[in-house]
């Protein structure tokens, strides 16, 4: 049972002190959490030290999100980040999987970022396959994983670079009941959410020809300044 955790606190930004990380870890364990996705970038070593000590399982990933560029410097940076992440975290027993991408596909909005981001499907599939193979080369002992957006088309493309054992597990970011409507907030609504999650997972299992899928993001947005 896991959660995503950002390295961020009000007043500190990304430079979260270790005592506040302990506070976060205590809260997660009180919730019954035993797995963490260090979203969406490698965290400081103290986070993984705590996970080692507490027996937490960790999904560690590079900040390769949404878009691929045709620029060679962009592609080189992604692969360098991957190698650095694996080599820095290799000796942490808590880390059980390396994440190679998060929601990377071909959104129509990519054109707004410039012509370098207008890539074709073959380029995307070829490059992401090479990223997965690089991760396997760097570490043969851990799972290679990824997260994808809740979209049939995006996952069909993603499945093309995931085949032949390139990627061990794929997760889908499913915000059912938050980014989709639910009829009520009672038992009927909960059943509706459960049924929708099961339906989507079964659909994506078929897309990837997989026996299991991860839910890599879930829940709802929150704001400490908003109260019911």
Per-segment meaning from a language model:
Residues 113-228:
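Extracellular glycoside hydrolase catalytic/binding regions
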Residues 1-67, 71-108, 144, 207, ...:
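Active-site-adjacent substrate/metal-binding segments within catalytic domains
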